[in-house]
């Protein structure tokens, strides 16, 4: 492949690790550091980025294509001078999807079996037998957002034996999953969900969507898993729902802000499990392989599956 991949992801100090990752999976690919003083943009350059600084935008506009190491690109499109005419591809690949599915399955099973109670009992040295008779095949899991990751997660849950439904903006069909679409159908979707999983993209339309009113459409005592974005959720409303029994428990991998301040009330709710945005971060080797494959597709004039629709924001 004659194209060159210029790496800015994770900063200057991370480049050697990235170089080794590319060497392991695609030793013939030309890779250089964004921070190399000798680097000057060439017509065949592609950028691998995460959170570029404002001063990077001028050079990004000279790229032939851009690959983001995150599944979300809202932080990029928030830059008013981000080059919207350059192909922008979100992170994907088998490892990214599998990691997300594994995390969600862990979270859903934990909510199903009341694992938070076991952890609290262990901390207190108390032998508390909270027997659970619910099983996966009688538990209804609903996934909000059926994009690349959401669809994969929904089907993974279905294969585990859960009764799975999904909700998205537009009509779709998905094997093993009952699909609802449109805002008019959202309350009906929620009414048949025991554990709600959020994997929506971050857009102005979805930010703050998950509030007390939305959660109130769920059956009393439902569970909630957020692996989308922290700002999808009105966090005070989430705490209210946990405190009054609207929700029996929740697992959050994303919050706002990140890192979560030490004095946040979220840390101290006994029905809430928080993880530090670790649900799905593929190895550098897997991300490098994905970037090489994306660049090869763009060089052939093909359209990658996760090419960003800038107008939609994902």
Predicted regions and their residues:
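N-terminal glycine-/charge-rich "phosphate-binding" loop or analogous flexible N-terminal tail
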Residues: 1-45
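C-terminal helix-to-coil terminal segments
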Residues: 87-103, 117, 258-314
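Short acidic low-complexity segments
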Residues: 31-43, 54-57, 177-193
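Rossmann-like adenosine-cofactor binding region
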Residues: 171-265
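Glycine-rich NAD(P)-binding loop of Rossmann-like domains
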Residues: 118-152, 179
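Phosphate/diphosphate ligand-binding glycine-rich loop within oxidoreductases
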Residues: 45-119
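NAD(P)-binding Rossmann-fold cofactor-contacting core
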Residues: 160-176
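Short, well-ordered coil/turn residues at beta-beta hairpins
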Residues: 50, 69, 199-202, 227, ...
């Amino acid at each position: 492949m004659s194209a060159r991949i210029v790496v800015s992801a994770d900063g200057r100090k991370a480049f050697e690790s990235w170089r080794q990752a590319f060497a392991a999976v695609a030793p013939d690919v030309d890779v250089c550091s964004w921070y190399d003083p000798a680097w000057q943009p060439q017509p065949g350059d592609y950028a691998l980025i995460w959170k570029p600084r404002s001063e990077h935008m001028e050079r990004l506009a000279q790229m032939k294509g851009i690959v983001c190491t995150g599944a979300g690109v809202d932080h990029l499109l928030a830059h008013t001078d981000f080059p919207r005419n350059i192909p922008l591809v979100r992170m994907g690949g088998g490892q990214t999807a599998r990691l997300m599915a594994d995390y969600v399955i862990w979270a859903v099973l934990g909510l199903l079996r009341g694992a938070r109670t076991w952890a609290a009992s262990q901390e207190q040295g108390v032998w508390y037998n909270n027997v659970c008779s619910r099983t996966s095949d009688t538990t209804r899991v609903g996934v909000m957002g059926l994009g690349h990751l959401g669809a994969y997660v929904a089907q993974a849950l279905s294969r585990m034996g859960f009764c799975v439904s999904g909700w998205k903006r537009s009509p779709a069909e998905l094997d093993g999953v009952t699909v609802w679409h449109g805002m008019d159908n959202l309350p009906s979707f929620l009414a048949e969900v025991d554990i709600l999983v959020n994997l929506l993209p971050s857009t102005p339309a979805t930010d703050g969507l998950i509030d007390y009113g939305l959660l109130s459409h769920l059956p009393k005592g439902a569970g909630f898993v957020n692996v989308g974005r922290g700002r999808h959720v009105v966090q005070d409303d989430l705490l209210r729902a946990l405190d009054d029994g609207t929700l029996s428990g929740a697992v959050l991998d994303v919050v706002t802000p990140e890192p979560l301040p030490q004095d946040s009330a979220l840390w101290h709710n006994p029905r809430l499990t928080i993880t530090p945005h670790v649900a799905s971060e593929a190895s550098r080797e897997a991300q490098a392989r994905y970037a090489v494959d994306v660049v090869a597709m763009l060089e052939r004039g093909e359209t990658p599956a996760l090419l960003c629709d800038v107008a939609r924001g994902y």
